[in-house]
Amino acid sequence: LRETAEALHSLLAGEAVTFRDYPTLASYFNFNPDRSFHLHFDSKTPTRLYCGGNRPLAMAVGGEFMDGLLFGGEFKAVAATGRLPSLIQIFDDAAKAAGKEEILPKLAQVKLSVSRDREAAREFARVNAGRRILGMRRLGFTSEDIIKLGVQPEEVDRLEIANREGASPHQFGQLVSDTMLDAIFIAGDPGYCRERILEERETAHQHGFRQLKFSELGPDPKESVRLLCEEIIPAL
């Protein structure tokens, strides 16, 4: 993450880079470490690099070397665990220690699935939500954190077993409760989603986020984008 940010900042500033100075990138992408690279165009406007990691080390590196924070798809759940303020503090402290005087911009990603067909919207998001709950455990969130989401650890154990045994998406999804789904996603019809997004906006605002980013959207992308633009965003 650090090498990517440093290399991109140099390239966008019109400088040439040699990947011997970035050994991790050279090894991972199989770059020739002795070749020099530069962009064949000038960056006409400032390009911000946003940190997409949301664990402590990524937050520290992002605050020091990047220009903003995009807190990913577990934003809703992490906020519910109570861990969000301490993670943001790591990011802000690292930025301040690096000499950045202004608070860096922050975006919160909201997992959304909206449709006139409420059940279709919820089923579309179910497997994704379950996999993200599993991911939170693997990233170090504790049983106590999971319980704060209204989910029991043994429910996550069942997901772990199903995933390990190669369950189909349908089989896996049957193990994902509505509580798990709602811990990660805002999923349902436009009226329901609008009210939940207004609540999420307030949570984001309280923690210093000034912009929401929506992902997934729903089972029918065209319908979901239309509903988002016409029936949800105007309320924001």
Regions inferred by a protein language model and the residue ranges of each:
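Acidic-and-aromatic substrate-binding clefts and catalytic sites of carbohydrate-active enzymes
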Residues: 76-82, 113-114, 186, 217-223
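Short, surface-exposed connector motifs at secondary-structure boundaries
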Residues: 39-42, 67-68, 208-211
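Solvent-exposed polar/charged
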Residues: 10, 63-64, 202, 234
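Hydrophobic faces of well-ordered beta-strands that scaffold small-molecule active sites
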Residues: 49-52, 69-71, 104-110, 210-214
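Long, low-complexity C-terminal extensions of enzymes
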Residues: 188-236
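Short, solvent-exposed amphipathic alpha-helical segments in soluble enzyme
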Residues: 66-67, 126-127, 230-231
